[in-house]
């Protein structure tokens, strides 16, 4: 959908889906330093494609993110349910909800990981096209929620991780609330482990 203002009115830009497939959820857009925009998405699968300047079409189609099936890229294999096939199969730690950023020439992809319940993990790469290297855990499984989708930003020289949990009254897996924690990157550029705080920020 497109609009001239964040408050709308919104309208369907192309009259149909940009991409269709099983697990095609949780999209995120990353705009690189050269102005090129990329769309990432996926659940039990991970895809990406460069967008045209109109931001509503792919330049050269889309494909699976290189290394998605490689434990070195997205964490050790574990048995997960493939809902499309109706049976378990061995998959990497990546589960869903990719979020891509860039810092000091390094690309960071954080994502919900490990199946259900999810924790937040991440991988890094020297290029938007990979190769990706699994770097471990950023946050533990969310409180009172079986999912934990997140994304970090830098604002006025400070770093913040936004995520969701089920801590509000009557909250649970399908009644989630947004939360945010401030953090500082480690000296080597890696994410620190970010604990939950009751007060958040």
Residue ranges and their predicted role:
Residues 1-201:
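Carbohydrate-active catalytic/glycan-binding domains of CAZyme proteins
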């Amino acid at each position: 959908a497109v609009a001239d203002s964040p408050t709308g009115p919104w309208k369907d830009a192309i009259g149909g889906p940009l991409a269709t497939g099983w697990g095609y959820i949780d999209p995120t857009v990353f705009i690189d330093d050269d102005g090129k925009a990329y769309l990432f998405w996926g659940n039990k699968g991970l895809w990406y494609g460069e967008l045209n300047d109109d931001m509503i079409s792919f330049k050269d189609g889309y494909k699976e993110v290189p290394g998605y099936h490689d434990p070195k890229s997205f964490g050790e294999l574990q048995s997960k349910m493939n809902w499309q096939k109706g049976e378990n199969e061995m998959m990497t730690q990546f589960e869903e909800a990719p979020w891509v950023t860039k810092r000091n020439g390094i690309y960071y992809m954080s994502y919900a990981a490990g199946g259900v319940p999810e924790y937040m993990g991440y991988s890094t790469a020297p290029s938007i096209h990979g190769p990706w290297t699994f770097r471990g855990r950023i946050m533990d499984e969310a409180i009172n929620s079986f999912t934990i989708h997140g994304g970090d930003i830098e604002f006025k020289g400070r770093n913040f991780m936004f995520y969701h949990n089920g801590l509000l009254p009557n909250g649970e897996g399908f009644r989630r609330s947004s939360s945010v924690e401030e953090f500082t990157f480690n000296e080597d550029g890696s994410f620190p482990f970010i604990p939950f705080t009751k007060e958040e920020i």
